[in-house]
Swiss-Prot record:
EC number(s) from the headed UniProt entry: 2.7.7.3
Transmembrane regions: none
Pfam family, any one: CTP_transf_like
Name of the gene this protein is made from: coaD
PANTHER family: PHOSPHOPANTETHEINE ADENYLYLTRANSFERASE
The organism's taxonomic lineage, starting at the top: Bacteria, Bacillati, Actinomycetota, Rubrobacteria, Rubrobacterales
Entry protein name: Phosphopantetheine adenylyltransferase
Gene3D superfamilies: HUPs
Species of provenance: Rubrobacter xylanophilus (strain DSM 9941 / JCM 11954 / NBRC 16129 / PRD-1)
Length: 164
């Protein structure tokens, strides 16, 4: 079985993330969405809560599962029996850091390949950080996050004080 990992913090999952997951699900036998933590950020929701939101919007994808990932991606990939990491690229600027991470992962787990999927043009500007900022400032995030979690995202990420 050809298993791929789609890792991220998904704080929150965006329509761009979901597009990459859907496209990866057509390329691989099984896709594991690995919900991790970014040590440089303090997420509003726990990894388990973010995973539940992703499960809700990927429920129609039979070959996609969602797991909380703790520790190194390479260790998680080994545990899952995966030899592929799928990453979305929005712009050339994403490539440099993703390339470095892919090289590091390959050093730690030589059998692990990284496959880059170019974001659809309508998602090329989209990031979780932008969604958090728009929601915190009272803006409309419709179309930026999956419809199935729109109200949840509005409630969690909107703040009356405008802080992100």
């Amino acid at each position: 079985m050809n298993i791929a990992i789609c890792p991220g913090s998904f704080d929150p999952i965006t329509t761009g993330h979901l597009d990459i997951i859907r496209r990866a699900s057509k390329l691989f036998d099984h896709v594991v969405v690995a919900v991790g933590s970014n040590l440089r950020k303090q997420p509003r929701l726990s990894a388990a809560e973010r995973a539940r939101l992703i499960e809700k919007v990927t429920a129609d994808l039979e070959n996609v599962s969602v797991e909380v990932m703790e520790g190194l991606l390479v260790d998680f990939a080994r545990e899952q029996g995966a030899r592929v990491v799928v990453k979305g690229l929005r712009a050339v600027s994403d490539f440099e850091s993703e390339f470095e991470q892919a090289q590091l992962n390959r050093t730690l787990y030589p059998e692990l390949e990284t496959v880059f999927i170019m974001s659809a043009s309508q998602h090329s500007f989209l990031s979780s950080s932008a969604v958090r900022e728009i929601a915190a400032l009272g803006g409309d995030v419709r179309g930026l996050v999956p419809d199935g979690i729109l109200e949840t995202v509005r409630q969690i990420y909107s703040r009356s004080d405008g802080k992100i």
